[in-house]
Amino acid sequence: MPRSLKKGPFIDLHLLKKVEKAVESGDKKPLRTWSRRSTIFPNMIGLTIAVHNGRQHVPVFVTDEMVGHKLGEFAPTRTYRGHAADKKAKKK
């Protein structure tokens, strides 16, 4: 169920402060964050945000198509290693 329009989009305050500081200074260094639940705002466009996926920080370059989505959507937490191969098929 989507968030109520009455409440508005969510962003962690510590991340918002980091973004505003980076925009003011024009710094292109990636911003490290653990806040996967924060919504991407228009003032984040052009920044690189390193989002934690549980093991490491995944760099995410924010574009205009990402506005309104959550940061966690762009840092996958699970690695897919493929299904087990059939032993009979290998012998042939």
UniProtKB/Swiss-Prot annotation:
tRNA-binding as UniProt keyword: yes
Per UniProt, the keywords (alphabetical) are: Ribonucleoprotein, Ribosomal protein, RNA-binding, rRNA-binding, tRNA-binding
Q: Name one Pfam family in it.
A: Ribosomal_S19
Query: What SUPFAM superfamilies does the database record attribute to this sequence?
Result: Ribosomal protein S19
Q: What is the effect of changing H83Y?
A: In MW145; suppresses a rimM deletion
Q: Name one GO molecular function term.
A: rRNA binding
Q: Name one GO biological process term.
A: cytoplasmic translation
User: What cellular-component terms does GO give this entry?
Assistant: cytoplasm; cytosol; cytosolic small ribosomal subunit
What this protein is reported to do is described as:
In the E.coli 70S ribosome in the initiation state it has been modeled to contact the 23S rRNA of the 50S subunit forming part of bridge B1a; this bridge is broken in the model with bound EF-G. The 23S rRNA contact site in bridge B1a is modeled to differ in different ribosomal states, contacting alternately S13 or S19. In the 3.5 angstroms resolved ribosome structures the contacts between L5, S13 and S19 bridge B1b are different, confirming the dynamic nature of this interaction. Bridge B1a is not visible in the crystallized ribosomes due to 23S rRNA disorder. Protein S19 forms a complex with S13 that binds strongly to the 16S ribosomal RNA. Contacts the A site tRNA.
Q: How does it assemble?
A: Part of the 30S ribosomal subunit. Binds S13 and L5 and cross-links to the A site tRNA.
Family, similarity comment: Belongs to the universal ribosomal protein uS19 family.
- Name of the protein in question: Small ribosomal subunit protein uS19
In its UniProt entry, the species of origin is given as: Escherichia coli (strain K12)
Q: What is the lineage of its organism?
A: Bacteria, Pseudomonadati, Pseudomonadota, Gammaproteobacteria, Enterobacterales
